[in-house]
Structure formats: C-alpha cells, structure tokens
C-alpha cells in the first residue's frame, strides 16, 4: 500500500499535537517515551510490519496504540479512498477482562471526545467487546427457565439475578447468577434457524451491531482471537469481522493462551456434559456404556500414577493403562458410528475429541506432551499439550500479512526479544521490528534496591529457610513502618512464614491465597498493612501511592519443573543452553512483573528487596537479575532503607 509522504508527515504531526497539546489540556502529562512509541507504532501499522514493543511501567501504551490506530485509518482512507479494505476494523486482543472494559468504557470515550472536539476526527470512535456465545442469554431459554422456577423455592439472590437477565443480555454483568442457571439460559452452541424469538433475539442484535461497518474497534481476549484464527485456517465461518490490523496487548500471555487453546484434555466433567446432552434425546445403553467405560479409564490411569493437586505429572504407559485406553477407544468408535447421523454436529465433535485424547495417550503421540493433573475434587484429568504452538501462531496470525503490534511491559528479557519471538512463532518472520520504550519513572531517585549480603544458604522449603526469611522480612517491615507487599513463589513457604510473624509484627497482616480479591481490597483500605501474596499478585494488581512502599521478593521466580518443561529441555544440546534460552528468560519476565508492583505513578517511592542469595552480588544469577531490572540506587544495609523512607515520606505516612 502506498502512502504519500505528505500524508505520513501530517499523521506524525497530529501525534505530536494530540500528546503535547490536547492531552495536557485535559490534565495529562507529556511523556516523551509515549510519543515516540506512538510514532513507532504508526509507522509499523502503515508498513504492515509486526512490531514488538516493550513498554515500561507508566508509558501509557494504551493511548499510544489507540492514537496510532485512529490515525492509520484516517490517513489510509485519505490516501486510498473508501476501499473495502481500508474500512475494515482493527482488533485489540488482551488477556484481562479489566483491561478490555477499561479500553471500551474509559480510554476510547475520552480519546473520541477530545479528537472530535479538536476536529481530528468527524465521528465518534465505535468499539465493541467480542466474546463467545456462552457469555450471552438466549431469550427463548431464559423464558423457559423462568417458568420452570416459578413454583420452586429458589435462592432469593439467584432468582433475582436470573430475572435481571431480562434487562442484561451479557451474563458477565450480573452478579449471583448460579453456574447451573448460566448453563441453562446461555445461547446454545447451534441456534435453530426457526427459533420463534430469532427476530427479536438480543444476541443476534449484538452480532449485527458488531458487524456494522462503523464499528472501528473489536476488542476480545487472546483465546477468542486464536479461535477466530483457527476458524479461518479450517475455512470455517470467522468469529471476528475481517480486520486490517491487530493489536495484541499483554502479549506475553499470548503463548499461554495458545497452549490452552491447542491443548486437549479429558476429565469427568467432560463425560458428564456429553452424557447430559445425549441423555436428553437418546436414552439407551450407549450412554451408560460411554459413562462407565471412560470413567473406568480415568480411574485406572489415576491408580497407576501418583498425582497431586496443582502439580503436573508425566504420563507413563502401563499394560493396564493400555488395555483400558484401547477399550475406551473401541467404545467411542461404536457410539460415534451408531449415533453419527442422529446427533447434532457439535455433540459429534465432542465425542470425536474424546476419542482423540484417548488415542493420543494410547499411541503416545509425539506431537503432544502427555501429562496428568487433578481437578478441584482430586480427580484425574488427561492433558495433551501441543508441541507446535509457534507454528500454529504463525499460520493463524502472522502469515496473513497484516500490520500488528505486540506490546507488554515484559516482552524483552535480558538483552533482547529472542525468547518471545520463539514463543510466538516470529523467530523466522522477516517483517518483525523491535522497539523498547523505557519507563518514564525516575527509578534512580524514587526506588531503592536491596540485595542482602548476609543471606544464609538453606535447604529449600526447610524450617531453617522459613525462619531465616521470616527474620529478614520482620526487619524490613519494621524499617518501612508496614506499607509492605511480600511476594512468594510458594504458598507453602508463605504459610509457614506468615504463621511465624503473625503475632510478631506490630502492623495489620493479610495473607492472600488463591482467588481472594476481597483480601486485596481490605489491604488497600488500610494505611500501613502488610500483604503476603503469591500467584496473580505478581502482575495483575495495582498498589499506587504509599500503600506499597516496600516490596519484598522472597525468591527469584523460577518456574517449577513439569512434563512440559522437561519436553522442552530435550530440544537443546545441553542443560546450560536450555537454562539460558528458556529458564532464565522466563524468570526475568516474572521478576519484571513483580518489580512492576513497586512504582505505579511518577510520584511513588519504594524499597525493593530480593531475599534470594542467587540474586546478590557474586550470586549465580546476579547479572541476569540486574539486567532485568531498571537502574536503581543500591542499599548496603537496613540503615540505608530507613534513611530512604525518612527522606521521602511525610508525617502522614506514619499515622
């Protein structure tokens, strides 16, 4: 596509006007790094390149890519006219629902308003969040469900939630809706063409709005983006309207979404779901045979392996496992052959997927890493993780030739982008450009890094280690008068240390386990509390201001070995090569995510301590740690920390 030099110059001048004039008029700071990032993004979108943009904390990358997209469309329409291609929307894919909602309800309305007021654009920017039909209400099924519960003594909150769906067709907007009600009223996998409510169906109206030619931005999560790509690859009907450019925010999560998307699994709930749908139409011995045989397969495999909740276990074939897997495959063959022409396509697909998983395990298919894990009820799940994720991403996304921006605060690891390029299938793609936008925050002034020199080497997960760590944490908390976030990589170690300190610390202490958002909210409402956390708190939670003035990273966040990483290791010539190519970059990415909790605004000040002897001067991974983090002043001892806090905090901090 050809753009005149004049149009390019005008587009770049408008970037400067937007960020240097319009945004400051509405109370936003001028950030040179943000402006340069936007220029880079625009050039790559117009040139149909794929840009890997590592954007440091506080850059404002969301406005950077939104402005770039708006100007790309404006000037490509001026240059090429109103061709069908130029009028195609752009897609923004993110990992988190929170960011999707913020883009739709905060970023886009603000940007649209000020650009219209200025005359940069003539019409509002229209956007929609796209997601699977299981999130939406089927009006026909809702009506049937309401009738079914009229005479029943249903939980009042759940009943109120169900009735509220008359006003809200997006079930994610409704609280207290039971999982069973959600399944009973959601849009079915295949809608009947002669549905009596099709003409007034709110879901169909939502789809029509999404396809409107004025709908410039389609927002979705990574899984939906990949599902659309898979549909296109298989010549199925696409989920998204044809688009001309792609923005992947939180791009470091794209490989994980692809692993989930292209991995296969089989568990008890899968069989129960299939039998439930078959049982509604086909009562007979086939259903009992299906349920009994597959449950027995899962039971036998579970008995032949020692599995623990939360731990992936490698699958090992035994004679007994082989016998029951073979029987399961034969049972599936007979059921599929008998019911093939009597059942809907989606149920047949479910049966075929079940058979496929059994075949992967029986034949020990080398295209997959075969492993086992437990569900919440400690029942076995068969898992097959694809070894071809990079190739799938290339085929579904990058080979289509459109411009794309992949951005995140943790794309770069160590000295470059080689790790993320390999993970996302971009290793051999020539049109990739790399760009680093450093954080505008003054880390040298506002952040103090402490790597204790007196850390004792202890056996991992031992009582001695927990006591040593507890002692250091106690000293640090008292030095900063609370206001502390302690990040663990192990829930077991976190629990031990918490029990040791709960009665020793003169500040409120909160321990966050899995799925405990209410505890995080409680911490934010306190003035000088201490939060012990692990898991998602490494990356998805914001603590601006003084609430986190001390961040303690207990251990370097190395991934726990599992069957998938063991399979990866075999691809490298030596263990050292594998550690440097995979293990260290993964650790650096997670470390940067955790470190990012320290400063969330330009005025934040924080002490960051890492209590892992491998990170300290002379430690095994000292250079890798320093390479991953921004340049900060170093603390020699606790006195330096106390001095830093006293000099940067006001009287109200201690109240």
What are these regions (language model features)?
Residues 47-67:
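Walker A/P-loop
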Residues 65-67, 71, 98-101, 105-111, ...:
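Signature of the SF2 helicase/ATPase Hel1-core->accessory helical subdomain module
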Residues 2-24, 29, 76-218, 222-223, ...:
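A substrate-engagement module of RecA-like helicase motors
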Residues 489-513:
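Conserved helicase motor "Helicase C" RecA-like lobe of SF1/SF2 P-loop NTPases
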Residues 189-216, 229-237, 335-453, 465, ...:
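A contiguous, basic/glycine-rich beta-loop/short-helix subdomain that forms a polymer-engagement track
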Residues 452-464, 515-616:
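Conserved RecA-like P-loop NTPase helicase motor core
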Residues 395, 454-489:
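Conserved interdomain hinge at the start of the Helicase C-terminal
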Residues 88-98, 405-409, 482-489, 610-611:
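Conserved RecA-like ASCE P-loop NTPase motor core of nucleic-acid helicases/translocases
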């Amino acid at each position: 596509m050809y753009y005149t030099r004049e149009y390019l110059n005008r587009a770049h001048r408008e970037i400067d006007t937007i960020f240097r004039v319009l945004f400051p008029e509405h109370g936003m700071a001028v950030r040179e790094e943000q402006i340069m990032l936007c220029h880079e993004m625009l050039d790559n979108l117009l040139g149909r390149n794929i840009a890997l943009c590592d954007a440091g904390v506080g850059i404002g990358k969301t406005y950077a890519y939104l402005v770039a997209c708006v100007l790309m469309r404006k000037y490509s329409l001026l240059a090429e006219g109103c061709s069908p291609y130029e009028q195609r929307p752009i897609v923004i894919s993110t990992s988190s629902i929170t960011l999707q909602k913020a883009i739709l309800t905060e970023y886009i309305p603000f940007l649209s308003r000020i650009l219209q007021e200025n005359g940069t654009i003539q019409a509002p920017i229209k956007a929609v969040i796209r997601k699977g039909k299981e999130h939406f209400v089927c009006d026909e099924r809702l009506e049937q469900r309401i009738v079914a519960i009229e005479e029943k003594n249903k939980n009042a909150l759940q009943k109120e939630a169900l009735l509220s769906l008359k006003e809200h067709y997006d079930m994610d907007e409704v609280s207290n809706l039971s999982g069973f009600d959600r399944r009973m009223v959601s849009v079915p996998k295949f809608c009947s063409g002669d549905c009596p409510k099709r003409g007034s169906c709110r879901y169909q109206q939502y789809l029509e709005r999404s396809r409107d030619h004025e709908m410039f931005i389609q927002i979705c999560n990574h899984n939906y983006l990949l599902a659309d790509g898979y549909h296109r690859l298989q010549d199925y009907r696409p989920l998204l309207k044809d688009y001309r450019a792609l923005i992947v925010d939180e791009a470091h999560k794209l490989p994980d979404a692809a692993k989930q998307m292209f991995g296969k699994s089989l568990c008890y709930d899968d069989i129960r779901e299939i039998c439930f749908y078959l049982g509604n139409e086909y009562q007979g011995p086939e259903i009992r045979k299906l349920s009994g045989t597959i449950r027995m397969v899962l039971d036998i495999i579970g008995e032949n392996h020692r599995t623990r909740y939360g731990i992936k276990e490698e699958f090992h074939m035994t004679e007994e496992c082989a016998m029951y897997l073979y029987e399961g495959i034969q049972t599936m063959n007979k059921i599929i052959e008998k019911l093939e022409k009597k059942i809907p396509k989606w149920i047949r697909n479910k049966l075929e997927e079940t058979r496929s998983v059994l075949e992967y395990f029986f034949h020990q298919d080398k295209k997959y890493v075969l492993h086992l894990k437990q569900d919440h009820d400690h029942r076995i799940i068969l898992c097959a993780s694809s070894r071809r994720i990079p190739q799938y991403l290339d085929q579904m996304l990058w080979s289509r030739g459109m411009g794309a921006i992949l951005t995140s605060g943790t794309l770069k690891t160590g000295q470059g982008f080689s790790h993320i390029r390999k993970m996302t299938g971009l290793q051999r793609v020539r049109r990739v450009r790399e760009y680093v936008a450093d954080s505008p925050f003054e880390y040298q002034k506002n952040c103090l890094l402490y790597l204790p020199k007196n850390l004792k080497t202890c056996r991992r997960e031992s009582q001695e280690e927990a006591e040593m760590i507890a002692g250091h944490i106690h000293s640090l908390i008292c030095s900063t008068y609370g206001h502390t976030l302690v990040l663990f990589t192990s829930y077991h170690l976190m629990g031990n240390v918490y029990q040791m300190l709960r009665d020793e610390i003169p500040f409120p202490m909160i321990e966050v386990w899995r799925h405990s958002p209410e505890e995080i909210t409680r911490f934010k409402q306190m003035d000088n509390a201490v939060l012990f956390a692990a898991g998602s708190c490494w990356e998805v939670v914001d603590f601006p201001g003084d609430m986190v003035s001390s961040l303690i990273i207990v251990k370097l966040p190395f991934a726990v070995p599992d069957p998938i990483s063991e399979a990866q290791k075999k691809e490298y010539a030596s263990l050292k090569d594998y550690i440097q190519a995979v293990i260290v970059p993964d650790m650096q990415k997670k470390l940067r995510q955790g470190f990012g909790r320290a400063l969330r605004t330009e005025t934040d000040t924080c002490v960051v301590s890492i209590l892992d002897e491998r990170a300290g001067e002379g430690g095994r991974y000292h250079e890798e740690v320093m390479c991953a983090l921004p340049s900060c002043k170093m603390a020699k001892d606790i006195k330096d920390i106390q001095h830093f806090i006293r000099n940067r905090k006001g009287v109200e901090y201690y109240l």
